[in-house]
Amino acid sequence: MTVHDVLHYLDLHVAPLSLKESWDNVGLLLGRGKKSVTKVLVALDATGAVCAEAKALGCDLVVTHHPVIFHPTGHVTDDPMTETVLDFLESGIAVISMHTNLDLALDGVNDVLAETLGLDHIMTLESDEDEALCHLIRTGFVKPCELPDFAAFVKDRLGCPGLRYASGGKPVREVAVGGGACAGYIEFVAESGADTFVTADLKYHDFQLAEKLGLNLIDAGHFETENPVIASLAARLGEQFPELEVRIAHHGDCIRYL
């Protein structure tokens, strides 16, 4: 079993690399493809703490959602911006990152988020006018309830230490979800007929816009809306490669709440 074998499976059966956005960086980002693999650690982020955990566990490979290398760099040193890359290289641990391709993929970030929130009749929100808006957002239905009650449910299901929400003046029935930073989809979601949008990384004026559009808006946190896919990804790797020991990283959200 090699790193390339794992990447081949992920590309063909989990999140095709061809789905990635043009600006993204995915696939095998660090290490040798021919490297033998016996232990894999799956994590949302490729941080120094994750590298240390992988090293302590004796892992040969780390599979992450967020890319270990995202912005172009002209050096890899112990500078804070590249030290994590150096940590992985010095530890001999390969890194595969599945980012926007996993956001868009069937049973990826957003399908798992929708399922975690108990949505029924989950569908991909499509646009006849703008291809760039297609394939990411998922919609589904919940039992009708008031927004504060649904927000409390989201907080509990995702393990949020806190969340923010704004009312569009409607009860919750048809819910759209976009894991991570999806503020750019607010108008698209409102036009779709959904009454509620669960996403993350929202600004003050995003909430104002949603209120004007009559859309309930919930910011449940970047980590919290994307991390559910990690357990799913680990389970799929374990089922496909029973000879591998697949572990889930213990790292959590770096954001703290008072």
Where are these regions (language model features)?
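Hydrophobic structural segments
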Residues: 1-258
